[in-house]
Amino acid sequence: MTDEIQRNSNDSLVGLYVYGSLVTGDFDKDRSDIDLLAVVDSDVDGDTFDRLDRMHARFVEDHPAWEDRIEVAYVPAPALWNFRTQTEQIAVVSPGEPFHLKAAGKDWLINWYMVREVGVTLCGPPPRALMPEISQSEFVEAVREQAEAWKEWVCKMRTPGAQSYAVLTLCRALYTDTHGKQASKKQAALWARAYLPQWAPLIQQSSLWLSESQDKEADDKAGLQETVRFVHDVAGRITGTGESASDASG
């Protein structure tokens, strides 16, 4: 894919980096996503956008097993360097979404921290040459802010697959808040089952939903209620608000 991105980006590619579970561990070749950051020297628009859009469509046609399992963020180099202070347009293809433009700024700090710390260079300079320093404390604070935001986002997680994603994401956020570093969803779930025994059945069920071929698209209202309680409980622990699960359900 590196050569394809280089060719279809009209030679604007500055660097390409892979991160996520493929790098940090617990990658499942049949189910896990591949996360890529493509740094480009200018905005992705016009002909470049159209070429990349067609390239990603062809890739799925040629490799159907990877449908909805590739995430690439195309980020102009100035936008990456100034992400703390400026919100700029980037191009993204991600699971469940077509190739599209979106605004990105400080809300992408978690991604850029992981690229900077553990990203593997596929082409171009090391990622640290293209983005400013990001401290561990900044990373942990961003995870805490995202955990708080999940109290609102979780209400939209109506299918078992989405609910499982929410549960495991909050497990990972709690692990990061406790240990100051990132873990894979699998590692964080195993840890959280012991750390939060009252939630162990839900965490185990969520892990199974994401690892087995089941119908993840049917609405699950009962599951949503329990997931909402879990998210509010864990987010409260992370942010120090101390909101109980019963508060969330009421």
Regions flagged by a language model, labelled:
Residues 1-17, 47-49, 242:
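Helical scaffold of the NTase/Pol beta-like nucleotidyltransferase catalytic core
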Residues 51, 169, 226, 230:
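Charged catalytic carboxylate motif
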Residues 181-250:
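Structured mid-to-C-terminal alpha-helical surface segments
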Residues 57-160, 164-167:
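Conserved NTP/Mg2+-binding pocket subregion across the NTase superfamily
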Residues 18-56, 69-74:
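Catalytic metal-binding acidic patch
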